[in-house]
């Protein structure tokens, strides 16, 4: 079995509303040194937070293209890998940009009024998460989950998929025995027969399917759960460095298209990063992701509102959230970055 593991979801909903001060560089002495120091001070640093699951940033970090593109613009790049706490780092201003997070998680930062701006979206991948059961299970549909033990990561996109699937099948959350387990614990429980079903995302889903001992009884298709992913940046960074943000957006878009055009090559790179998964498993997982990077549109956030309303009703979000009440950055139509849009009324 592979050593793949995902960062814990515990604590991702906490938000710390403060920004860290940056230290000043020492001044040079003498005209030549002062000139050198001024050039150094003119350069800024883009701090990027990512995880092992952050496909596009992983590839950009490996090929060095982001450093080259931003270097021309006068920026250095600093990478910060997180096993957990990425959103807290964003909320506190410890990093300027974050890698993609699933639709549901973005809502928790919004509910906490974190000073974040949405700058890109990966379009929907509805089959990249699913409800699975053992191949020999008597469960053949969501309605059969009544009274059964179902493992899911609390507050994840999969949690929304489960709640939406239960509602469509005429079941309430209390009609099933929901076990809140992180992915690694859920994997052990599922394979050990301690839960009857598991709601999980790729590449865990692909790994289980490749082992050929599971069946999918529902995924996000047929309008059940779109499973979009969002990229966010601190408000301060967006307002001060739109040129850098545009370069990042363009490179994410290009890299996403490269992954879809070169699935085998991408799998060779990602397999060891993802815990030495078989390349075929990575290819299967990536085949279900769109990797289509587009600007975020306020008029296309209906799914976010459905998730927010569902989580509010389930008591997971303490306040009502209006999905369109966010800050959005979009690339300018003529090459210059557009200004950050104001909050929707």
Which residues does each predicted region cover?
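N-terminal export leaders
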Residues: 13-25
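Cleavable N-terminal signal peptides
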Residues: 29-30, 40
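Short, glycine-/small- and polar/acidic-enriched structural segments
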Residues: 42-172, 178-180, 196-202, 225
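Small-molecule pocket liners
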Residues: 56-57, 125-131, 214-215, 227-231, ...
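Pocket-lining segment of extracytoplasmic ligand-binding domains
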Residues: 101-104, 178-179, 184-273
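Secondary-structure end/capping motifs
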Residues: 239-318
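Conserved C-terminal helix/tail region of periplasmic/extracytoplasmic solute-binding proteins
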Residues: 309-345
């Amino acid at each position: 079995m592979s050593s793949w593991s995902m960062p814990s979801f515990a604590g991702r909903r906490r938000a710390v509303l403060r920004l860290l001060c940056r230290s000043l560089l020492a001044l040079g002495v003498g005209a030549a040194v002062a000139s050198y120091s001024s050039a150094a001070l003119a350069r800024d640093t883009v701090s990027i937070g990512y995880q092992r699951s952050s496909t596009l940033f992983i590839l950009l970090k490996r090929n060095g293209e982001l450093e080259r593109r931003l270097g021309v613009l006068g920026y250095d790049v600093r990478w910060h890998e997180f096993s957990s706490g990425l959103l807290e780092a964003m909320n506190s201003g410890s990093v300027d940009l974050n890698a993609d997070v699933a639709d549901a998680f973005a809502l928790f930062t919004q509910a906490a009024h974190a000073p974040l701006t949405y700058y890109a979206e990966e379009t929907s991948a509805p089959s990249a998460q699913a409800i699975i059961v053992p191949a020999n299970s008597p469960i053949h549909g969501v309605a059969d989950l009544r009274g059964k033990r179902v493992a899911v990561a609390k507050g994840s996109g999969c949690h929304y998929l489960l709640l939406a699937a239960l509602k469509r099948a005429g079941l309430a959350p209390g009609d099933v025995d929901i076990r809140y387990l992180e992915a690694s614990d859920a994997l052990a429980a599922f394979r050990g027969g301690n839960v009857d079903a598991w709601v999980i995302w790729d590449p865990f889903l692909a790994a289980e399917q490749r082992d050929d001992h599971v069946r999918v009884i529902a995924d996000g298709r047929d309008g059940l759960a779109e499973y979009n992913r969002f990229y966010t940046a601190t408000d301060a960074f967006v307002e001060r460095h739109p040129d850098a943000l545009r370069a990042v957006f363009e490179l994410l878009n290009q890299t996403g298209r490269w992954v879809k055009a070169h699935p085998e090559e991408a799998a060779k790179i990602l397999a060891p990063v993802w815990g030495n998964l078989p390349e075929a498993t990575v290819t299967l997982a990536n085949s279900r992701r769109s990797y289509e990077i587009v600007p975020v549109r306020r008029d296309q956030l209906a799914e976010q509102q459905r998730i927010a309303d569902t989580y509010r009703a389930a008591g997971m979000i303490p306040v009502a959230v209006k999905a369109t009440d966010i800050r959005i950055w979009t690339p300018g139509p003529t090459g210059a970055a557009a200004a950050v849009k104001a909050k929707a009324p």
